Amino acid sequence: MSLILRLASASLLVLMSGCANVSYYLQSVSGQLDIWRRERPVEGVIADPATSAALKQKLATVVRIRDFASRDLGLPDNRSYRSYADLERPFVVWNVFAAPEFSVQPVRWCFLFAGCVSYRGYFAKTDADRFAAELSGQGYEIHVGGVPAYSTLGYFADPVLNTFIHYPNAEIARLIFHELAHQVVYTRDDTVFNESFAVAVEIEGVKRWLARTGDERGRADFERRQRIRDEFTRLIEKHRERLEALYRTRIAPDAMRSCKAQILGELEQEYRALKQGWDGFTGYDRWFAHKPNNAQLASIAIYTQMVPAFQALLARERHELGRFYKAVRELARLPMEERTAALRALVPPSRTPE
């Protein structure tokens, strides 16, 4: 798609959005245009004598990962992740999450094509921080998190970015598989469904990628990282459920605040004990740098709540990805309550997410 056509398409998003949220859409369009301005075909970057040997090697690996994604995983065969852009910043967007003082359910915002989602993304951290401050002033608990990649859901070709090209190869594969999965199935107004599906695809995809490449060191590192991720997720979910149960009670606000503080304090204590078994890995310390709150816990649950259900569905479909995608598309057509109930029915009660 030419830059002029892209500009026209992006401008159309603003015109169709009406008066509400115009400033937000304008920053979105500006950020997207900046990415397009910077992107170059991967082959051209590899052939450029000015490109470092390390980047050339990483991009060559990306080419293999991208081909594998479509050939072996049935993910879309299009121009996404066939170009590269250096944004000269650590994240492509910063997502703002918010939740009330006594709820672990995130605030949702609704957009033209994406529908209603549980976060709001900004291309500039200053804009994200400004919006977060506004929400905080309204009494919400907030969390601002940097994001290395995002999907335009197939409307445009998403590039490889400097924000994640330095990751270990398995993590690059994980991210590309995740974002391409959003182009396979995406249902409006159900962030947990969309993200949990993409996480299930990324995990299965990386396992198959590592098996195909025979990278034993990469496989061991991936399994270690996945174990740590799973342990962290279970810890967060445990205390999120405790808070959810607390907020359902009718105790006085002051008493509820006291109980909430105790639960969050125990979360921090258990994290410090848990990471002792992680061989020096401290990747989640930054998450605990500020006192955890409802918005932070919600930001994790969005991506993990229904992953076991999707993995059970994949197993039911004999790990045949074509059948799995078809089953997920059928679920996506159901009303949200029916869809959620069908997913919950796939896992034993002890593993069913709250």
What is the predicted role of each segment?
Residues 65-229:
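Acidic/His-rich structured neighborhood in mature extracellular/periplasmic domains
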Residues 17-18:
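C-terminal motif of bacterial Sec signal peptides marking the signal peptidase cleavage site
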Residues 2-10:
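Sec-dependent signal peptide recognition
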Residues 32-69:
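Amphipathic alpha-helical packing elements
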Residues 43, 56-59, 63, 128-132, ...:
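Extracytoplasmic/secreted envelope proteins and their assembly/folding machinery
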Residues 21-23, 35-45, 103, 170, ...:
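Metalloprotease/metallohydrolase-associated module, dominated by Zn2+-dependent proteases
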Residues 49-50, 63-73, 135, 139, ...:
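Sec/Tat-exported extracytoplasmic proteins
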Residues 233-354:
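Pan-zinc metallopeptidase signature
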